[in-house]
C-alpha cells in the first residue's frame, strides 16, 4: 500500500488531514433527542392572546432558530459519527478521504446553522457579539465557508484546498479556530433556551446570554 507524505496529502486534499487521528468531541446524546420546539410553540400561541403584528417578528426569529438548532444537532451527531468512522479506518499516509470530507461537510453544516441562530438573536437584542470571543470566531469560520469563492483567487486563500478543515480539538480556517467543546457548549445552551422560548411569554423576554 502506498503511503503519501503529510505535506502532499495536506496540499492535495486538506490541511492536516494526515494529522487528524483523534478528536475530543463531546457526546451530546442526551441533547440530541426528539425536540418539539416548533410544535410546542405553535400550540402555545393558540391559547395566548396578544397583538399578532407585534409578535410576528419574534415568531419568525423563533421558528428560524428552532429549525436551525434542530438541524445543527442532527449535523453534530452525524459529524461525530463520521469522525469516528474516519479514525477507525485511518491509515497513516493513506486516509479514507471520502469519510474525511463527509465529516467536514457535516461540521460545516453545524457551524453555519449555529451561526445563523447566534446572529439572529444578537441582532434582535442589539448586542455586539464581536465582543464575545467564541461567537466572533464562529462567525469568522462561517464567513470563510460562505464566501470561499471570493477568497480562492486572492492571497487570503493561501493556496488552501478547502475553507475549513478538522484538527484534533476543533474546526479551523486560516483566520480562526473553534473547538468541538465550544461548539457543544453553544448547542447545549441553545437547547436549554429553546426549551424555555417555546413558551411565547418567555420568548418575549428572550436574550442571548
Show the residue positions of the predicted features:
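Amphipathic alpha-helical interface segments
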Residues: 1-137, 164-209
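Histidine-centered, metal-coordinating catalytic motifs and their short helical/loop contexts
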Residues: 132-157
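Interfacial non-cytosolic loop connecting adjacent transmembrane helices
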Residues: 154-166
